[in-house]
């Protein structure tokens, strides 16, 4: 499944747009990866949204990734889970999920990226690229140059994340992101 980790990677944000409507729109527009991210949603709401999003991503032969919640990813038969630095460690997530799920990890520094790759992460989300309103605690933007630095030390796909908008997406791609 790792070979399918390319193309536009979209992260949903229910406070900005309905996740089901936005998933449909981005898939029609060519996105190949969609991440269900809804920090304040209940488990039941995540499962409801996740099952519907899973149906849509299958129709478009796209991947569905669940943010933070390995239990939800397994329950809805998602394609992967995306873990932050304070979430479940990659080796434990891999022991629980086996090879059923892709495991992505957020990395801000080269060292975090190197560690995630050595622990068995399938891909990295590097950022924040720019200031983001959807994750106020994201930290200081690292910019697209960080992607190049990280790609020099890891052999897994790297995506830019955080604050990416149509007007700055090209900078992220030029930085070496698999897509964003």
Q: Which stretches of residues belong to each language-model region?
A:
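Conserved N-terminal beta1-alpha1 strand-loop-helix module at the mouth
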Residues: 1-90, 94-122, 139, 149, ...
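Short glycine-rich anion-binding loops that position phosphate/pyrophosphate groups of nucleotides
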Residues: 87, 129-131
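Glycine-rich beta-strand-to-loop/alpha-helix junction loops that act as flexible
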Residues: 126, 159-164, 180
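Phosphate-binding beta-alpha-beta segment of Rossmann-like dinucleotide-binding domains, i.e.
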Residues: 131-140
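Conserved cofactor-binding/catalytic machinery of classical short-chain dehydrogenase/reductase
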Residues: 146
């Amino acid at each position: 499944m790792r070979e399918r980790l390319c193309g536009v990677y979209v992260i949903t944000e229910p406070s900005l747009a309905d996740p089901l409507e936005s998933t449909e729109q981005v898939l029609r527009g060519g996105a190949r990866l969609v991440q269900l991210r809804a920090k304040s949603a209940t488990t039941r709401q995540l499962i409801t949204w996740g099952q519907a999003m899973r149906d849509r991503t299958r129709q478009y032969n796209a991947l569905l990734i669940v943010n933070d919640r390995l239990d939800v990813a397994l329950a809805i038969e998602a394609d992967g889970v995306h873990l932050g630095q304070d979430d479940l460690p990659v080796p434990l997530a891999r022991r629980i999920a086996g090879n059923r799920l892709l495991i992505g990890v957020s990395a801000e520094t080269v060292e975090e990226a190197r560690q995630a790759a050595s622990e068995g992460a399938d891909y990295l989300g590097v950022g924040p690229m720019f200031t983001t309103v959807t994750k106020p605690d994201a930290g200081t933007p690292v910019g697209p140059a960080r992607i190049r630095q990280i790609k020099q030390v890891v052999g897994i796909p790297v995506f830019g994340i955080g604050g990416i908008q149509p007007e700055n997406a090209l900078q992220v791609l030029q930085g070496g992101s698999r897509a964003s």
